[in-house]
Amino acid sequence: MTTVPMITLLYSGNFGLGHELETVLHAVHRLNSDVNLQVLLVGGGKGLAETRRLVKELRLMNIEFRPPVPLYRLTDLLASGDIHLVSQKARTEGLIVPSKIYGTLSVGRPVIFIGPQKCEVADIVRLSGCGFVIAPGDVESASRALSQLVLDAELRKTMGQRAMRYYREKFGRKRSVARIIDVIEQVAGNGQLDSQPVPLIDKGLANDK
């Protein structure tokens, strides 16, 4: 009899006002018993207590909470996840961009993004083909995406390779350095940065990266 390996869904980052974890927790609750999944939630923030409360309410036994890790351990942590969760609440487009998407791409892992359909992270996931974009509250689609990724090793591998390729093409060191040089040259040529008004937004969301 073939042993089905345990697959880890990783969420690493802030449990903040702009992040949405309810959908994925309800999706995990709905999974069939043959889906061998553990969920690792790493980080802290204002939403952590509510997340713990919901886990307890749903009686989820395959959830593990861990405190934030120091920066030098971050790459190892990201590599430990087989699937990565990135989340963003509805109506936060233009206010926050969950930076964890870039770390996920850099370690070549498939992504489940739960958030607005039209935002930077959704565009990255679609353009790269590295995962699924799911609207907040769509528990059925989230559960289906989890099942597919847990049960299909080839799909995880393919989406992970796409993530790594997209990261190298769009956000690799050479590309990033070239962008920085381009910005510096533009500023030097113009003598100043374009002045743009900064919108006033909720402080909690402003700190939510």
Please report, for each region that a protein language model flagged, where it lies by residue.
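Conserved donor-binding/catalytic core segment of Leloir-type glycosyltransferases
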Residues: 2-19, 25-28, 40
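Nucleotide-activated donor-binding/catalytic signature segment of Leloir-type glycosyltransferases, i.e.
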Residues: 6, 36, 40-43, 48-75
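Conserved donor-binding loops in enzymes that form glycosidic bonds
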Residues: 11-16, 44, 67-68, 170
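Nucleotide-sugar-dependent
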Residues: 19, 68-79, 84-105, 110-123
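Amphipathic alpha-helical segment in the mid-to-C-terminal domain
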Residues: 71, 139, 156, 169-177
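Conserved acidic donor-binding segment of nucleotide-sugar-dependent glycosyltransferases
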Residues: 116, 127, 132-139, 148-154
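A short, well-ordered alpha-helix in the C-terminal region of glycosyltransferases
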Residues: 141-144, 148, 155-169
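C-terminal alpha-helical cap of glycosyltransferases
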Residues: 173-209
